Amino acid sequence: MDLLLAQALWVLGLLSDERLPEEVGVRGLEAGLDTETLCILSILMPNESKEARRLFEKILEEFHLPEIDKANAARIYARDISKKILKNELSPSDGANRLWDASIRVNDPNFHDLDTFIYAASELESRPGDVEFFNSEIIKEANIWVKHNS
């Protein structure tokens, strides 16, 4: 259970309040993070989203995680997706498309950190004959994210 990744997903709108009990509460307990707040979060029903949000914010405070903006959330997510690409848990094209979506969610025209992934994903759609090349470029960029952004 990676609370920082959960926070990043939540900030980007990729982790809904309804999923917090399972994704943060239950998984946190399974990972050995045994706090009263996590226990309470883990037993909430999906329709208790306001309470789930409040408890998640409290958990972030308990673990001393500062608030993050969408750009930093996207960077955290990019490291995670890059690791999954390199471990073959996610195809290069799927990973690049997810990061393209994350970049859109940042909603900042000056945010260009994920542009290599975005370019490759967009070109994959229009140049199917160059799939190997673009997959290779996505893997290279994933390596950079894992090595230089950890």
Tell what function each PLM region has.
Residues 1-150:
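Acidic, Ser/Pro/Thr-rich low-complexity regulatory regions
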